[in-house]
Each structure stands twice: as structure tokens, then as C-alpha cells.
Design a protein with these regions (language model features):
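Long, contiguous binding/interaction regions
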Residues: 1-56, 60-114
Length: 114
């Protein structure tokens, strides 16, 4: 994972081939606790649910994720409520996973408990 933390997300407006299943599983080993999911269109996502003591902690976490996403120029889908936040990451422009998704996941995992 350390090598992912040193990297920065690269702008992607398409033209890049999404990771195949073997690449996805190789990179998944570098980010702890992230599940590989698919949506109804068969697009792969990295998904992780975080739990917190209350709503305010969930909200603080989401705000930090938002700051990281802006710095990286790569934006996850986030849902949150009382005591939880779920983060889903994909590279929308290519309708699949790329190294950017794993870089962002690794950086999100570095957020200290709020």
C-alpha cells in the first residue's frame, strides 16, 4: 500500500482501458477491507463501509474524504448517516476500475479516527 500513498491520481477523461479481473485482485491486496462490487450495469467499484459512534463523526469523515478527493481530482460516491459512511470508488470515465481508485482508497484508509 505504501507505494499507492506516494502516488497521485492522474486525470482520466477516457481512453484508458479499465483493469481486468486479475489486475483488480492484484491491486485489491494493497488496500485492506475494500470489497469489489458491481452495479446494475456490471461496472466494478471499490466499496467500503466505515462505522462511527454517531452522526457527527460520520459527517466529519465524509468532509475529510471530500478534501482528499478534491486534492486528488478523483471523486467517490459517498452515502452516510448515523454511525456509518459507505464509500464507493470507480473511474466513471472508463466505466471501471483504474489505479486511481486504489490510490484514493489507500489515502482514505489513512484518515485517523475522528
Amino acid at each position: 500500500m505504501e507505494d499507492l500513498l506516494k502516488k497521485k491520481c492522474k486525470p482520466c477523461e477516457g481512453g484508458v482501458v479499465p483493469f481486468d479481473v486479475s489486475e483488480i485482485h492484484k491491486y485489491q491486496k494493497k488496500v485492506d477491507g475494500w470489497d469489489i462490487t458491481k452495479d446494475k450495469n456490471e461496472i466494478f467499484f471499490l466499496t467500503k463501509k466505515f462505522t462511527f459512534k454517531n452522526f457527527l463523526e460520520s459527517q466529519k469523515f465524509v468532509n475529510v474524504v471530500g478534501k482528499i478527493a478534491e486534492e486528488e481530482g478523483h471523486h467517490p460516491d459517498i452515502t452516510f448517516g448515523w454511525g456509518y459512511s459507505e464509500v464507493k470508488i470507480t473511474t466513471h470515465a472508463i466505466k471501471g476500475l483504474s489505479e486511481n481508485d486504489f490510490i484514493l482508497a489507500a489515502k482514505i484508509d489513512q484518515i485517523p479516527s475522528v
